[in-house]
């Protein structure tokens, strides 16, 4: 009975550790950037305001995954930072209003790719431009 319990606990530990995301507590690499928003009228013909967007959701995809792995929110200055990342490729995205009126959901994803080559690297992305 004792051996079965030890084997079961070992298997559970192996399964849990093999399913871990690419976030790494010992790593200091990060991806940072800003989200810049433009607010237009309903027909998108007149720019009403623009600003760095606070409280905007920003998503990250680790490697070749098909769904986002983590989500954070921009700070009051529109800044975001994904921390504790391993070496590898990442896709960062945000959502913006569709200005072409061709997407049923009325929103489109804006993507930027990033590569971390060193465990202490800080990758600074260009600003995301979104329509509010």
What does each of the following model-derived ranges do?
Residues 49-71:
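Short amphipathic beta-strand segments in non-cytosolic proteins
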Residues 97-125:
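Structured interaction patches on ligand/partner-binding surfaces of diverse proteins
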Residues 29-38:
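A short, amphipathic beta-strand motif
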Residues 75-84:
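Short, surface-exposed beta-strand/beta-hairpin micro-motifs centered on an aromatic residue
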Residues 15-18:
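C-terminal motif of bacterial Sec signal peptides marking the signal peptidase cleavage site
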Residues 2-9:
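Sec-dependent signal peptide recognition
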Residues 88-94:
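A short tyrosine-centered beta-strand micro-motif
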């Amino acid at each position: 009975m004792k051996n079965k319990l030890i084997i079961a606990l070992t298997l559970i530990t192996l399964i849990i550790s093999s399913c871990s995301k690419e976030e790494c507590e010992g790593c200091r690499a990060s991806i940072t950037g800003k989200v810049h928003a433009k607010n237009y009228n309903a027909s998108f013909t007149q720019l009403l305001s623009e600003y760095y967007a606070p409280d905007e959701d920003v998503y990250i995809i680790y490697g070749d995954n098909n769904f986002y792995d983590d989500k954070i929110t921009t700070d009051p200055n529109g800044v975001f930072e994904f921390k504790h990342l391993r070496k590898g490729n990442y896709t960062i995205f945000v959502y913006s209003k569709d200005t072409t009126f061709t997407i049923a959901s009325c929103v489109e994803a804006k993507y930027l790719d990033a590569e971390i080559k060193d465990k202490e690297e800080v990758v600074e992305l260009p600003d995301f431009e979104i329509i509010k």
